[in-house]
Amino acid sequence: MRFECNLPKEIPEYYHYEIRDRLKETVDRVYMRTEKLNEAMDITKLSFGTFHRLAKEVFDWYSDPEKGNNVELFDQMSPKKLAREVKSRYTKKEFPDFIEFPNTIVLYDTAFVSTKDWELLRHFGIGGSDSSVLMGLSHYNTLEGLYYDKVGFPVVLDDKSKNQVFKRGHFMEDTVIDSFCKMTGATRIPESRMFRSVKYPNTIANPDAILLMPSGELVIGEAKTAVDVYNKMVEWRNGAVPANYVTQTTQYLGVMNDPRLTKCWIICLPVQDQSLGGEYIGSEITSDIRRQEIPRDEAFEEEIMQAEEKFWKTYVEQNVKPEPSMNSELDKTVRLRFVPSPISNPEAPKRVLSFEQYNSLIEKYKKADEALEAANKLQKEAKNTRDSLKNQIVEAMEDSQEADVRDASGEVHYVIKNKVSNTDYVKTKDLKLAFPEIFERFGYTTSKMLFSVKPVIAKKK
């Protein structure tokens, strides 16, 4: 077994100009590391699994900024020096080799890239976590947002909550998998490679773990965490699992396309985000783990990967932005991440738009605006009527919080309740002044664009 890299050596023109150079530099660096790892492994004459484990220790040590190091020190190391570093850590203990998966392509080994480079290299395909967008099941992204992400549009407004989820998941991944192994008796097989589908080359997968079950069954393990607020994990009740995780794991099984992999176990551990300090605390009780098996469904795998390949060839390769979704709020949120808001650049010159091109669009906008105004008027009238009638009923109830509406025979037709409901609010301005660090961690800024269309009345000649 050898280290492999099959990243594209030439960067396609459809990628955004701001990331093309960085992509090229990163790809070259990964190829260089791959070659050096193979040369050093040959020198040590260690098995792939043992060399991989020890070389990973070397890479992590030389990449750790807390030790005053940086990854450039590893890159400057010769194969001979790397071999010496690995041999110095060898204690005669052997580690298992990876499993060969002949029906998929190894893109590269994620164990020997930084998190920053890993995020950059995700531009080379559609991953499992992207699949829910293609299947219309994502509450957080749209086709337009996925297009911006894959071609490499620079992020204008970072999503702090998404970054928090990623950091938490990465930090707790081994804990979740290890807890599952203790519960089930499963054995974790070493795996850290990014894979690419043979049939659909723009579809990629980076499984969290390959597990050997006590029955001899080989499965994928996908670790998840969820903040357990008052123990209300609604999406995980009664054996249910969030739909986006189902598409993600189904896509993984499709990319691997191996008859030995019969299913994927989705394993979720409730956690608490420690407010200060950035540490993540998981439950100590393994029974708190939610787990659900997703068996192979080759028809669904095909449906997902066909949609991903079609998206890539239609939009990414052609540099064509998809149409907005039917969710205007989500469209706006996603677009603000990648497209600078006009209010952020007050110095921009006034633009001229073609009347012939935009008149029809503006007329449709005006009609929609008029319909909305009429609906708002009706809503306001209905609300006033409702409130007036409610006040008459409340007056009849006097100071009671509950009343029965009975007929002459005593039969109850309605039960009316009028209770006080308290809502907590945070004084954000005061919080920002008193505890700026906490505000920075949990606060966010929203932008509102004031849009209007006014007809211009032509002057009489």
Feature map (PLM): residue ranges:
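Accessory terminal regions of nucleic-acid processing enzymes
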Residues: 1-461
